[in-house]
Amino acid sequence: MLTMNNLLMVLVQALRQHRWLCLFGVAYIFSSVGNGLTQTLILGQLLRWHAPPSTLTLTYMLATLPGFIGSYLGAMMYFVTYYLGSASYFMWMLAAHILGKAAGSLLAKRLTRNFNKVQIFGYCAVLAGVLSIALFFAPKSVFVLVPLTFIISTLYQATTTLMWVMMADVADYGEWSQGKRMDGIIFSTFLAVLKLGMALSGAIVGWTLGFSGYVANAPEQTSLAMHCIVALFTVVPGLLSLAAFATLRWYKLDDQTMQEINLAKMQTIVKG
């Protein structure tokens, strides 16, 4: 998000000096709307086809790849540069993150064969949250941070994969309770919340660093700025992961409930 914020500040300054550049802003807005509609249509169709979670996850990752590069990797670069003291460790952290995401998708698929997916989501969210917060207190050593990053990324990706399974369950529940599928509405709502979360996270990062006295490109940062940089990369994601676990108390579509719903749908089809 830091990289994205810096680029946006340059854009705002350019718009102030050259009003005609506003045309590019309008074009960007229409492009974003078109991109959102495309993602909604594609993923909505995949849900109607009952595509496997791995396909949904891969489609989502490809659709959000530019935002991922501009936000998470930017934050990781600042964390590595100022906390570990050398940007050369960035590739190690990035490799651990990418391998963790691949392992998380495989882990979720294997666990859902024998365990309740809602419980697995909760366990992974809690473990990811606790380990992410523990990362704040971990020794400043690449030999500790890289393995922890791999484990945390694995757990986060497992929850992401399970989220798509749960979204498909919501679509099936909507069809059972309302008599029609609402895949487009479900995904477009999710996408809108996702975009809102990305916007708020970028704003929170900028406000926090501004409050902490962060100075861009400075060889050293103040103690408060350093703590904020590390907290934004560790504690904040951990707390949000724990908050995601807390919301499961309102999610009632466990495996047993979905079996009953699918059975009722099959009986309706047979009678019809």
Swiss-Prot record:
One of its GO terms (cellular component) is plasma membrane. SUPFAM superfamilies: MFS general substrate transporter. It comes from the Bacteria. InterPro entries: MFS_2, MFS_trans_sf. One of its GO terms (biological process) is carbohydrate transport. One of its GO terms (molecular function) is symporter activity. PANTHER family: MAJOR FACILITATOR SUPERFAMILY (MFS) PROFILE DOMAIN-CONTAINING PROTEIN, MAJOR FACILITATOR SUPERFAMILY DOMAIN-CONTAINING PROTEIN. Belongs to the sodium:galactoside symporter (TC 2.A.2) family. This is Uncharacterized 29.9 kDa protein in crtE 3'region.
